[in-house]
UniProtKB/Swiss-Prot annotation:
Domain Era-type G as annotated: residue spans: 8-176
Annotated protein name in UniProt: GTPase Era
Gene: era
Cellular component per GO, a single term: plasma membrane
Chain positions covered by the region annotation G2: 42-46
Pfam families per UniProt: KH_2, MMR_HSR1
């Protein structure tokens, strides 16, 4: 018999194809913006922990890059390897799928999670867009056939629909453990990392479909001076033309990027922010394994 009052703690991997709502789901569960989001695929590049402690239960969510096909650069290999590694050594796996469409990349992820031996939950996202819920039944039945050991829960990550039910199922699957992190800690990532991600998010929201994947952000200075947090961020691109696009006509685009990033940073860090942005050309960085490691992309 399970002790419902036991202290529980464990790791929960959130996996799925790009742009399916994984980071939105994490942010809604945590009740604050931690993972960056955009409408463009492959927004998330690194695994990041989002930690939620509620009473005796501590769930440590692993937000992962979207598993994707195509893209032969070292950066693409890194993201796929990072996402696949998250399936190992976790206590629960959440496979997020979009009810509105099924792609080859969804199928690729499904074929990988079929080998998960621990608890597997399929979070059927964007069900708020379906007026007649009976339309969900064929898809639910098909998913259950493909993943007979999975528990399928319809949700809306954007609207927060049915997330309480999802979290209840997750908590029931977590092992009895002492908590691994202090109850007020929400992530394993540094403030410098979060600041860089916020700048990159604003770039992705400002620019076209291809350019954001050839951009990364490095924080060169992160210093509290009195009541103001001073942050200097370096935006790396691969070509001179990309630098001009980011700066924009008379510097208008980079000014908008900085203004939007600063507002989110002030909310996240609860401090006045002085943000300075620079753009630098570093040719071929996204396919240079040594450069990627120096930029914090780990083992490739």
């Amino acid at each position: 018999m399970t002790d419902t009052n036991a202290t529980r703690c464990g790791y929960v991997a959130i996996v799925g194809r790009p742009n399916v709502g994984k980071s939105t789901l994490l942010n809604h569960i945590l009740g604050q913006k931690l993972a960056i989001t955009s409408r463009k695929p492959q927004t998330t590049r690194h695994n990041m922990l989002g930690i939620k402690t509620e009473g005796d239960v501590q769930a440590i969510y692993v937000d992962t890059p979207g598993m994707h096909k195509g893209g032969e650069k070292a950066l693409n290999r890194y993201m796929n390897k990072t996402a696949s590694a998250a399936l190992k050594d976790v206590d629960v796996v959440i496979f997020v799928v979009d009810r509105t469409k099924w792609t080859e990349e969804d199928q690729m992820v499904l074929e990988r999670v079929q080998y998960v031996t621990g608890p597997l939950i399929v979070a059927l996202n964007k069900t708020d867009r379906i007026e007649d819920k009976a339309e969900l039944m064929p898809h639910l039945s098909w998913l259950q056939e493909q993943l007979p050991n999975a528990q399928i829960i319809p949700i809306s990550a954007q609207q927060g629909h049915n997330l309480d039910a999802l979290e209840k199922v997750i908590a029931d699957h977590l092992p009895e453990n002492d908590h691994f992190f202090p109850e007020d800690q929400i992530t394993d990532r540094s403030s410098r990392f979060l600041a860089a991600e916020l700048v990159r998010e604003k770039i992705m929201r400002q620019l076209g479909a291809e350019l954001p994947y050839q951009i990364t952000v490095e924080i060169e200075e992160f210093k509290q001076q009195g009541a103001t947090l001073h942050i200097h961020a370096l935006i790396l691109v691969e070509r001179d033309g990309q630098k001009k696009i980011i700066i924009g006509d008379k510097g208008e685009r980079i000014k908008r990027i900085g203004t939007e990033a600063r507002k989110d940073m002030e909310l996240l860090f609860d401090s006045k922010i002085m943000l300075n942005l620079w753009v630098k050309v570093k040719g071929g960085w996204s396919d240079d394994e040594r450069a990627l490691r120096s930029l914090g992309y780990g083992d490739l």
